[in-house]
């Protein structure tokens, strides 16, 4: 959950830590040290919302960051839905990264075809299946949005796709 935190922490014992520049530098150093083909970079969701960057720039900077950092795949989090499905679809269309979420059916919505249940990545000659799962968002996402989503329990779906990917 990066929640649009572009800048490092400003105060307290974590002052100066975090932020996109620091994250990117660390990720690049790991890719250099271990070889980029040996590093799998995933985002578990909630890259949206949380600071004025999201509010003022409409979520575009977060998409640019995910693309620039060359994530291998991202999952959706509940805050990705804060501005509605159509707006989320607009942002997802601008991602150069596979978006995965297996336990919601987006058929018939603006996200139809943009979000896959899983992706198979290849790193260091090995195929790796990445399944995206999202918690039940009914208590934290606007009811009008939730009514457009078909939710399935993550454990059931994870087991189903694990069998498919074996």
Language model region names:
Residues 2-166:
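Acidic, metal/ion-coordinating pockets
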């Amino acid at each position: 959950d990066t929640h649009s935190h572009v800048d490092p922490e400003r105060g307290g014992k974590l002052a100066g830590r975090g932020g996109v520049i620091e994250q990117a530098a660390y990720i690049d150093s790991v890719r250099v040290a271990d070889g980029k083909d040996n590093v799998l970079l995933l985002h578990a969701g909630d890259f949206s919302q949380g600071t004025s960057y999201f509010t003022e720039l409409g979520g575009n900077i977060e998409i640019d960051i995910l693309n620039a950092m060359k994530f291998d795949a991202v999952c959706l989090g509940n805050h990705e839905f804060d501005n509605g499905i159509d707006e989320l679809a607009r942002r997802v269309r601008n991602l150069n990264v596979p978006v995965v979420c297996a336990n919601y059916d987006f058929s018939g919505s603006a996200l139809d075809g943009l979000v896959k249940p899983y992706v198979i990545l290849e790193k260091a000659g090995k195929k790796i299946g990445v399944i995206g799962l999202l918690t039940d968002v009914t208590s934290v996402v606007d009811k009008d949005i939730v009514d457009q989503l078909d939710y399935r329990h993550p454990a059931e779906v994870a087991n189903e796709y694990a069998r498919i990917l074996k």
